Amino acid sequence: MSRLREQYENEIKDAMIKKFGYKNAMEIPKLDKIVVNMGVGEAKENAKVLEAAVKDMEAITGQKAVTTKAKNAIANFKIREGMPIGCKVTLRGEKMYEFADRLINLALPRVRDFRGVNPNAFDGRGNYALGIKEQIIFPEIEYDKVDKVRGMDIIFVTTAKTDEEARELLAQFNMPFAK
């Protein structure tokens, strides 16, 4: 069992019950999944760029990445329907907790001029979205082998009903929110 999962089972559940007064154990919010998405706009000119992005994504998450395709054509961006334009990974279970642990304790502190993540990036339904400007903050990525610095979106999907509950859950996981 991963460190964050153990922390959730032993400490966080009790703290959440104390704070919000849940009567049923199933009411306690938990991390449902983490979706990591990387939009690669240059993929329309060069397919090798997308391959490199997929390789980086797989190294970071430890799971096979799925290429995302354009849903509809956008003439201004020279994109046709069905063109590969990015990649994503959906993490659940143990891999999700392992990734969250690495992100919170290893990767985020390596961001330049890091003052904490935005505490207001919740969507109103208890999900948290986080944007990262460069993939080189992860220890799995070798700096010398990176062809181009790319950003990614990380979405924490929780079973929380409100943003306040989700914020407390992530704060219990030691998510470094900006003050």
Curated annotation (Swiss-Prot):
Keywords in alphabetical order: Ribonucleoprotein, Ribosomal protein, RNA-binding, rRNA-binding, tRNA-binding
GO MF, any single term: tRNA binding
PROSITE patterns, per database record: RIBOSOMAL_L5 (PS00358)
GO cellular component: ribonucleoprotein complex; ribosome
Biological process terms in GO annotation: translation
InterPro entries, per database record: Ribosomal_uL5, Ribosomal_uL5_bac-type, Ribosomal_uL5_C, Ribosomal_uL5_CS, Ribosomal_uL5_dom_sf, Ribosomal_uL5_N
Subunit field text: Part of the 50S ribosomal subunit; part of the 5S rRNA/L5/L18/L25 subcomplex. Contacts the 5S rRNA and the P site tRNA. Forms a bridge to the 30S subunit in the 70S ribosome.
Family per similarity comment: Belongs to the universal ribosomal protein uL5 family.
Protein task: This is one of the proteins that bind and probably mediate the attachment of the 5S RNA into the large ribosomal subunit, where it forms part of the central protuberance. In the 70S ribosome it contacts protein S13 of the 30S subunit (bridge B1b), connecting the 2 subunits; this bridge is implicated in subunit movement. Contacts the P site tRNA; the 5S rRNA and some of its associated proteins might help stabilize positioning of ribosome-bound tRNAs.
Protein name: Large ribosomal subunit protein uL5
Organism: Agathobacter rectalis (strain ATCC 33656 / DSM 3377 / JCM 17463 / KCTC 5835 / VPI 0990)
